[in-house]
Amino acid sequence: MLADIHTPVGIYLRLRDRFRDTVLLEGADGHASDNSCSFICVNAVAGAEVRTYDTLEVKLPGEKPETVKIEDGRRVPELLWSFLKRFTAEGDVREASFAQAFYGYTSYDAVRFAEPSRLGGRREAMIPLMRYRLYQYVIAINHFRDELFLCENHIEGLPSESDLLLSLIRSRDVPQYPFALTGAETSDMADADYLRIVDRGIAHCRRGDVFQVVISRSFRQGFTGDEFNVYRTLRSINPSPYLFYFDYGDYRIMGSSPESQLIVRDGRATVHPIAGTFRRTGDDETDRREAD
């Protein structure tokens, strides 16, 4: 269907109160023919989750979660791949592949599963280290062509509610809730300590130990109301081609990025470090030439 009167944010707001585990991934670069899609994933039916450094939880459609003990962290990619291979998909239409995928995240601390020597002692995980879900529905919006696709995974024993989704997509009602800050902002590190770490990072770059380093610290802020307003503000003050908002019930993850960090296409994985970005012009040919 045509998508010129629909927005990913509007659709997400209409669906999230009616369907559990709804997540949003936005491709906001509507001037580019590639990677100009947004996705709203609705109703998780299966998935895998590394809850702690020692525990992997997997779930199949219609079954109770199964816990797998992680004996060797280096086998986590193998365990996840083994789980993914338990699924088969039919159909060769390109748009169908939007639904035939697992959506989720891999946290920074999960790097120890690939390279255990990279990190020191374990930090307490506030959220699962990795979480990926297969969804019954994926709404895909191609901003370049103004097309909207409602993709559904037909799973035995799982009733379809696609008609309800379509009615909500077409609805004019967009529920919104207030948001307010409470208390003062706090950080886990004083300004002076943070600046000392920045100086160390600069020194490492000058010595040639690294060509890029990201220095960060955590902030905390109390609030009341709907966290989605924070995401809406983020996409307004920091508009980026790639944005995401994952609402998992007991925690939320949101963010924006100027570049796709990893692209997998035709069996090849390509990494795009942030240090290699370039100014976008809006012209595909010029942008492609600058990237090369």
Feature-to-residue mapping (PLM):
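Extended alpha-helical targeting/anchoring segments
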Residues: 1-292
